[in-house]
Amino acid sequence: DAEAMYANMDDINEQLKKSFGRLHDWLLSGDYLLYPADKTAKEDVLAPIIAYGKACSAASALLTDLDWRPARLPKLSPAQLQDLHGGLWELWRGEPEVVDGVHARNPALDVRDRPVAIDFGTSSTVVAYDDHGSKKLLRVGVRDFDAPIRAADFENPTALEFVDLPALLAVWQSEAYRPMLNWDDLRCAHEALDHYRSNEGDATLASSILLKIKQWALREAHDHRVCISDQILGTVHTLPPLTLRNPVKGALIQVGADDPLDPVELYAWFLGMVINWRRHGLHLKYYMSFPVDYPREVKDKILAAFRRGLQRSLPAPLVAQREYLERFAVEERASEPAAYAACAMPTLGLSPTDRKSVV
């Protein structure tokens, strides 16, 4: 992670100071003229400098790619990292500090009090949030966030594409908050569906893509099991039925190798990474809608999976501040018909006369 990378660079910095002194003496002595006979001495002097350059490059890429690598959100610029009023949530350790020119930012400064609405659909999911009084929709898994926006972009396909299962699980089951997943190991939403549609004759690719995750959630333990296989190794994984795994209110989520692979939790995490993007702020309250006839036990399982996935999209330094973890909530707020009516009635110039009749 970023902290470990910088700890390594502290050691390299010490070697670097010594090497620059030796390099200065070496150049003054004229010994460099003996190259290649003095190749060993040259390499000995330059090795820490080369290592430092590589470490700086790796650290820079790690930090600028923090959002792009897992969710293909735009890369961070050096200006964002070094801005006194910007910086990184990931580096926050309880007080302001600057690490190699990068500012640590308290994520609590970016918490938004406004709720996020999620319509988790069978084929697609719609996410809406309040941006300083302006209601906006979100796009998830699009190839280019800077491309012209289309209305269809907001219908986010409820799909996951498994490219490298072992690599995915190694990270997902070892890091609870903001695990550094790689988009090249697991893709979501628009890009996953685009790959499926453009390669419909490819059985290997088709078996790696899980469509209509909401339908999978309806399966019971006695139903036919769903299997997926990844694209890299052909690893076959049988998905267990969705179970009720609610995080404990106010407690940090723990993960481990025995955790089941839950597509609903994974999908919710992707949504959360976009919802809680640096440009949008951090959100603690989420409202979901469900079909009227959806079984109560299935709703509870989906809500639990979304609680886990959305909470895991928050920065660890934020949930470490327990007051914010206590405020985190994912609730069922309305049925889909009621939510639709609430949106449509103002447009039609209608007002409810009895509150109970529309909720």
Short names for language-model regions:
Residues 80-91, 253-271, 294-302, 333-340:
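Phosphate/oxyanion-binding active-site loops and adjacent basic polyanion-contact surfaces
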Residues 288, 292-341:
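Glycine-rich phosphate-binding loop and adjoining helix at the ATP-binding site
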Residues 38-84, 298-299, 316-320, 324-328:
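Charged, amphipathic alpha-helical linker segments immediately N-terminal to NTP-binding catalytic cores
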Residues 107-137, 345-359:
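Gly/Thr-rich phosphate-binding beta-strand-loop-beta motif of the actin/hexokinase/Hsp70
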Residues 133-161:
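Flexible phosphate/Mg2+-sensing switch loops adjacent to catalytic phosphate-binding sites
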Residues 87-112, 320-356:
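Conserved phosphate-binding catalytic cores of ATP/NTP-utilizing and phosphoryl-transfer enzymes
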Residues 1-57, 156-294:
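Conserved phosphate-binding loops in N-terminal lobes of ATP-dependent enzymes
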Residues 132-136, 142-144, 299-309, 347-351:
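Short secondary-structure boundary/capping segments
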